[in-house]
Each structure stands twice: as C-alpha cells, then as structure tokens.
Regions:
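Eukaryotic intrinsically disordered, low-complexity regulatory regions enriched in Ser/Thr and Pro
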Residues: 29-30, 49
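Bacterial N-terminal signal peptides
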Residues: 10-17
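Metalloprotease/metallohydrolase-associated module, dominated by Zn2+-dependent proteases
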Residues: 135-164, 180-226
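Bacterial N-terminal signal peptides that target proteins for export
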Residues: 1-9
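Metzincin-family zinc-dependent endopeptidase catalytic domain
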Residues: 46-168, 179
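Boundary at the C-terminal end of the N-terminal hydrophobic targeting segment
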Residues: 21-25
C-alpha cells in the first residue's frame, strides 16, 4: 500500500454526491440499462479488467461492457501538483461520454491517476447521481488500488485489484440505483486498503433482496454468457 498510515486512515471510499434520505422501497429504485467501464489510454495496467467484468456480469442483470475513451485533463483540473480534482474530472467525464448510452447507462471512468476532493486527502472512487437523475456516473482511481504501477502494463496482483474495484463499483451501482440502506456489508465505509480488502463483497440480506426485486441483481449468481 502506498501512502502513509495517516493518509490511509483519512481516505474516504465511494463518496456519493447525491444520497436519498427517504425510507427505502423497491419502487424507489431504478435498475441500470447497462454498466459501462471506460478505459482511457493512460490506463495501461488492464489485466484486472476482464476478471472485473466477469465478476460484475455474474451478479448484475444489466449487461456490462468496456469502452475505450479518448479523454485528457488540463492543468486547471489539478487539486495538488500530483492529484486531480475528482469533481472536475467527473464533470469533464460526464461531458465527454454524454453521447454514449442512455440516461440509464451507469458509466464508470477507470483512471490511473490519484484523485482528491476538497475535504479529503485522496479518494478511491466517487459517484454522482441517484434514482431521480438523468445521469449516473462514477470515477475510480486505480492509483492506490493497483498493487503495481497502473501506468505500466503488468500482471502483478490482477485479481486483488479486480476485487477492490469490484467492491467499489458494485456499491456505487446500488447507491446510484437509489439504495439508501445503512453502511453495512459491501455498503460499509472502509478508510484504508486493509479495510477495503477485509470487508464483505456481498450485500446484506435485506439490501440484496431489494436489489433483486428492483431488477438490479440476479436472484442467482451465474455467468451471463455474453
């Protein structure tokens, strides 16, 4: 794990910009029409992508696909000399990918760059939207999730990286769908890579049932065959 222990404890995972506060009901959830993982040219460590896609396809009703994306970032998007401002990145990503998919496409940009928010030293992932919005997007930084250098092609620890990203993306999908349950099981809020690695990769029973009823999760995990 890179970074000091102090920074690790200060890290926040998957900060949702819009969170519903009303009591949960199946009718309030929206299922994605598809889940798209966008891969910029700068992301050269990609061995984790295939197992990530396979894992998501096993549990999600919606199809999951990857998409190459030409995207660049200007200096005014920097939060520090070595970190991008996650809000500026997400806003830019939303504009670049706006013509791809539909309002119910859940779109995720996988970046090798470190991200920062205004109040946190760094973030692993952030998502924007909920069941009421016409956008559902997320940004995931593999800078600290990749066990090697994400800007260099390598095979080291691909399954570890895939599982870390899987937990973040699956939690985000549930939140963007409108799930407002407490932070528990996969929805828990780790503050370090160790906590992320140790936390469950599954939903608690009540949340799992709500997501199945809403058509977000499959009733039984299985390969989709696509």
């Amino acid at each position: 794990m890179r970074g000091s222990a102090r920074d690790a404890l200060a890290a926040a995972l998957l900060v949702a910009s819009v969170m519903p506060s009303a009591a949960q009901s199946v009718g309030s959830l929206v299922a994605p029409a598809e889940v798209v993982l966008y891969l910029p040219a700068s992301l050269r460590s990609r061995d984790f992508v295939d197992p990530l896609v396979c894992a998501l396809r096993r549990v999600l009703v919606a199809p999951v696909r990857t998409q190459e994306l030409g995207i660049s970032f200007s200096r005014d998007m920097l939060a520090t000399p070595s970190q991008l401002d996650v809000d500026k990145v997400a806003h830019h990503f939303g504009k670049v990918a706006t013509d791809d998919g539909t309002p119910l496409s859940f779109k995720y940009l996988l970046l090798p760059y470190d991200l920062k928010s205004t109040s946190l030293n760094y973030v692993f992932a952030t998502s924007y939207g909920n069941q009421t919005t016409r956008y559902h997007i997320g940004v995931v930084s593999t800078s600290r999730l990749d066990v090697g250098n994400p800007r260099i092609a390598h095979q080291q620890g691909a399954m570890v990286t895939a599982m870390r990203v899987y937990k973040l993306v699956l939690k985000s999908i549930a939140r963007l769908a409108g799930l407002s349950g407490p932070e528990r099981c996969i929805l828990s809020f780790p503050r370090s890579l160790d906590e992320l690695d140790q936390k469950s990769a599954e939903f608690c029973a009540e949340d799992h049932e709500a997501l199945i009823a809403a058509g977000v999760l499959k009733a039984e995990e299985r390969d989709s065959g696509d």
